[in-house]
Amino acid sequence: MADQLTVEIIAAIKNLAQSENGGRIPAAIGDITADRQLTSLGIDSLALADVLWDLEQAYGIRIEMNTADAWSNLKNIGDVVEAVRGLIAKEA
């Protein structure tokens, strides 16, 4: 079972994926879980930068990586969740 942070980040990424795909998620994608690859949702490096900005604002954190680093290090939703979780713990 996903924790609250995972649920919130999946929702944010799902919303972004919908906007990147004309307002819908193709049925072929299926369920969106922490294992889901960002590219399978149509999220590219520019869209990832948008979601990282939104997460910084939502959680009061600063993600210290440029878009290229983020793109190479954050391959799936779980990677994003763990990066945010670590930064939240650091801020506490």
Curated annotation (Swiss-Prot):
Post-translation changes: 4'-phosphopantetheine is transferred from CoA to a specific serine of apo-NodF.
Show the SUPFAM superfamilies listed in the entry.
Answer: ACP-like
Residues recorded with modification O-(pantetheine 4'-phosphoryl)serine: 45
Q: Does the keyword Phosphoprotein apply?
A: yes
* Record keywords: Nodulation, Phosphopantetheine, Phosphoprotein, Plasmid
Q: Identify the InterPro entries for this entry.
A: ACP-like_sf, PP-bd_ACP, Ppantetheine_attach_site
Protein origin, superkingdom? Bacteria
Where's the Carrier domain? 4-88
Q: What does the function comment of this entry state?
A: Proposed to synthesize nod factor fatty acyl chain. Involved in trans-2,trans-4,trans-6,cis-11-octadecatetraenoic acid biosynthesis.
Per its record, how is this protein called by name? Nodulation protein F
Q: Which gene encodes it?
A: nodF
